Amino acid sequence: MISGEMSRWTDAPRERTHALGLVFPPAGDHYTGMQLDFIGAIAETAQAYGYDVLLTTGSKAGDHPFQRLLAGRLVDGVILMEIQLDDDRADLLSELGIPYVLIGRARVEKTSWVNLDFAALGRDCVRHLADLGHRTIAFVNRSEHLFRSGYQSAHLGQEGFVRGVTELGLTGRTYLCDDDAAAGEACLERILLEDPATTAVVTMNEAGLGGLYRGLKRAGRAVPRDFSVVGVVAGPWAERVTPQLTAADMPAAEMSRVGVELMMERLKAPDAPPRHVLLRPLICTRDSTGPCKPVPGPDS
């Protein structure tokens, strides 16, 4: 439902504000390191085009921060992030005729977007581990809240993981994990409790990564001698853990740059066909994966 205030957005010519709205809700109680990387890169790229960036939250169309941004007519266009498969924020922007782009991908494609091929990356991580001899692998996803809300990367990444283990005849389990180190440690404990034969983890939860490592240390599993970890995270964060994480590095700077470029294109030619950019970075082999070492049995 469009309020009377917002319905007047395109009723009359408007002067350009030379500002972009960035609608980016934090993953949990605070922004993760990867999210902060995106915010900084988007602001830097927008500045190069002569635009300021107004950051606000709002994961749903009815959330007050999102409503205030639109009702105030403070921006020329909107960049949406933390995309859900069925994203009512995008639906509202389309209904209002407000130029917008996605960093992410919704189920219904109404505008330009840039995204990672999370499904393919999930499969790539499984193949990397399978090539090292791992047969029992766990997938550590994002939080239950994000998954149940339809968070697109969580769903696509898990679909790719499941497809990968199925195609290769491996044993795989999936786990939802809150975005913090304590949750990562608890998740790792649960993984080993439910299947002690697990020798590797694929993760998309960079905020829980330190906890996964801590849990492995507590369990007496050395990385990568006894246990391998591979993920999809931003490169700087993969390099901050010890041993450094083998990962498909999320190109936050490139995705941010492309997102702003797509926004500029929408502002210049709003009636042009939308453009879609799908990125699939290669796995960067660092120090957290190695050949599978069989898990000793209880009598060993």
Please place each PLM-identified region on the residue numbering.
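Bacterial carbohydrate/catabolite-sensing allosteric modules
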Residues: 2-4, 40-49, 94-102, 106-300
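Alpha-helical recognition/docking segments in bacterial nutrient-uptake
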Residues: 2, 6-10, 14-127, 195
